[in-house]
Amino acid sequence: MSTLFLIGIHEIEKSQTIVQNEHYFDRVIELQDLDSLMVALYKDRVSPFPNVHNFETGVSIVLYDPSKFQLSVRQLDVLFKRFFPSFNISAIDHTREENLQRLECVERENSICRNRITRINHWMYHHHDDTPDGINKNSYGTVNGNSVPTQACEANIYTLLLHLNDSKAQHLRKASVPRLIRNIEFMSFLSDPIEKISQEGSHYWNILSTWDFCALSLSTQELIWCGFTLIKKLSKDAKVLIADNKLLLLLFTLESSYHQVNKFHNFRHAIDVMQATWRLCTYLLKDNPVQTLLLCMAAIGHDVGHPGTNNQLLCNCESEVAQNFKNVSILENFHRELFQQLLSEHWPQLLSISKKKFDFISEAILATDMALHSQYEDRLMHENPMKQITLISLIIKAADISNVTRTLSISARWAYLITLEFNDCALLETFHKAHRPEQDCFGDSYKNVDSPKEDLESIQNILVNVTDPDDIIKDHPHIPNGQIFFINTFAEVFFNALSQKFSGLKFLSDNVKINKEYWMKHKKPQ
């Protein structure tokens, strides 16, 4: 969905260009000021699933008069990139008619964002010029018969490279949180969990405290609340305090840095891994509250900005992000850089503590690279697992692949979602056989790309209902084979060894065994 925001623009002030281009947007919202805009963005982002107003499946434009609000277009765009990194949103000064040509790009931009394969392709491979704001004003193309700055259009759609470069730029700026954001009471966007707490005060703490935790059953508001509840407790235990509103701003910014439209690698997965990390820490790091806090924070940030694909796809097509990290642990380095920048801005005290401890958070995130799995398996079997750097790596690795250790009813739902994401990777590879990954998204070859079904209805069913594993297999009969492969290749030996070293974790290997037995009964012939 795409939105045109008209900020402080009265009907009489609308130019003919605005009126003529309103139909490119799914909705037009008139707001009094930029404060109201910030509230609208946050409220939309935490709407219930399926959230059509996530600002990722369409392009949104903010029209306003900078002179009225003492905030330039550039400053507002920087604010968007800083606090809403995954959003396809940009600002335009509506008082300058030549700027309004930008509206004519929206139809083509929306076609890229609404097709999940062209959207992911753009995220991963789109090339940018080197101008500070990502816009080459000398590059023009034709859209709807008019000459428009195509690079300016393309720069409005999220890419991994833009996310990374904007994050680095923010690190250099070291700007304070602007008033527009600072004055927001973030608790006001969490009405659903607050209402539930009023009825049952310990509700979220109870679900966080069990291995049967199911992040799939929670709304975005509830996921943020779970993160808030757990981190607040851990920070108090570690005596590394942060004000409630600052912690909520960090969590809202982090959620907006993940892609809601991803099936598996999203904020839901981040909360799931953080909860699993904490539960493992209660067994393995009982007397170290600072390390527990650091490791749980690494867990919630370990996949930030994840495109829902893999390192191999980035390497094979020689993406600029892959080249940036010399084809080594590409996504893990990408997540690490983004998350450390977020912490440097929102919780610098914690980042400082992390760096004093052999760059604790950085090492933990890099340990999640599955290409290194066998190395950590060897460490588990042949080294002292209580060695600090080995232990933190083992904990976050176990948490990252903990889906196969959850109860079967939960594990099967995660299996379904990762299968959908793998299917997207296969579709992306097929797409590359007909299109160069980095080619101009506004070229003619993009016009007739088939749009694959978004699977929203089936995903909603998985999230809302406790779906029986048998029903999942009926619709996706090859899931058992995929789960058996993953368990045999990565999980079984790892969790068996972990359980042998730490007897309190035997329930993990027991659950893997139970789940594998179920999948084996439903295995399809090769």
From Swiss-Prot:
Checking PROSITE patterns in the record gives: PDEASE_I_1 (PS00126), PDEASE_I_2 (PS51845)
So where's the catalytic machinery, residue-wise? Answer: H265 (proton donor)
Q: A GO biological process this protein is involved in? A: cAMP-mediated signaling
* Source taxon at top rank: Eukaryota
Give a GO cellular-component term.
Answer: nucleus
Q: Which family does it belong to?
A: Belongs to the cyclic nucleotide phosphodiesterase family.
Q: What is this protein called?
A: 3',5'-cyclic-nucleotide phosphodiesterase 2
Organism equals Saccharomyces cerevisiae (strain ATCC 204508 / S288c)
